[in-house]
Amino acid sequence: MPTDSVMEHQRIWFEGLNRGDVSAADAAFASDCVVHITGVPEPFRGIGPWKEFVAVMLNAFPDLRFTVEDQVVQGDRVAFRWRATGTQKGPLGAAPATGKAVAVDGLIIDRIVDKKVQERWEQWDQSLLLQQLGLAG
């Protein structure tokens, strides 16, 4: 897969996230995508449930900003390391807004089919996020 195709998928998705635009998923993910996140018991199956999860995070952290720190492309797989920063200004599950700033690093491996994410494996430290919010010890 040409690197330009990968860069375009990544650009669309992260620019959308940084604008708070969940609909960017429509251009970056297949409608029947599967997204696995370490620590989440079941994968998100389909773009609808994935967008709902992302919307919850963007509501909790409306100033959420992602940067891609590193990227590797091999065949139909794209791996990248990212950093997210934001301030919890909305509820996160049962936890009310704390007003606290967070910074979290993560890793993603995407399997690309027809220039869209068909399957994603994502790992980031949810415990660190909760600690930064004062919600875990």
Predicted regions and their residues:
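C-terminal and inter-domain tail/linker signature
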Residues: 1-137
